[in-house]
Amino acid sequence: MTLLAAVLPSAALPSSVSGIARFGRTQAGELCFCDRDPGAEYAEVAAGSLVLCTDSLAVTLSNRFPGITCLPVPDPRALFIDLGHSLLAAESVAVSDAVPRPFGIHPGTKIGAYTDIHPETRIDEGVHIGAHCVIHRGTWIQAGTIIRDNTTIGVAGINAYRGLDGKVRNFPHFASVIIGPGVEIGAGTVVVRGITTSTQIGAECVIGNLCNIGHGVEIGERVWMSVGTLVGGHTRIHDGATLGMSVAVKDNIEIGAGAQIGMGSVVVKSVKPHASLFGNPARMVGPIHAGPNR
């Protein structure tokens, strides 16, 4: 609240902030930011949401989303980042409630040498974690999942923003990583935790060696992802999709269910269900036989 008080008149200060969330996904009392017109992307924003925004957006947002509280500031994104880091530094801030309590490691878990697991994680029955892995705070690994050597789960990513003051800031990462049952994650892979929404990997997925899964990515069930695949933040990959070796997927797009993307492709637009793509940029081609059924 000290940071808010420094830039807002006392009359505009909220009495309390219950949490931080992404614009469009807030609940009453939660703080978010909006520094550009959201257009038709969001049909509604919960009444009682606290929105850091520019002066020019305040009237537009208030008219479009009745019941929200707009907090006009010169640089909403920068202030949101600063507030987030301030909250993360406070010991009282809880891990995302997406991870069920109690925390703990199931006694039957197999853990390799020199692996570090934060105490505020949940690891279910039958999980096998290899050597030299790091499992960060706020991770939930469900039953029967295998994580191979040198893998990092739940690390904060690098999502930089240069503020109006010229200072470069990195977004704080509040959310979790949720890995479903029966998943296999290859050696040297990095799964970044979400900023405000959890990074999720569905049941029975196979994630190859040396992959990078960005913040807030949502992967459905039985997705097959080969060696060296890169997936940008907030992308959704639906059930049964197959991504070949060294595929790169842009942030904030969707890969439809059952889609197949050939080796080395660069995907910059959303992909329809059951489509086959190949190339840079990826384009529609004839059927590709990839993944476990090739």
What residue ranges belong to the model's regions?
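Terminal amphipathic alpha-helical/low-complexity segments used for targeting or macromolecular assembly
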Residues: 1-102, 108, 144, 150-151, ...
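Structural signal for interior beta-strand "rungs" in well-ordered beta-sheet cores
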Residues: 33, 98-285
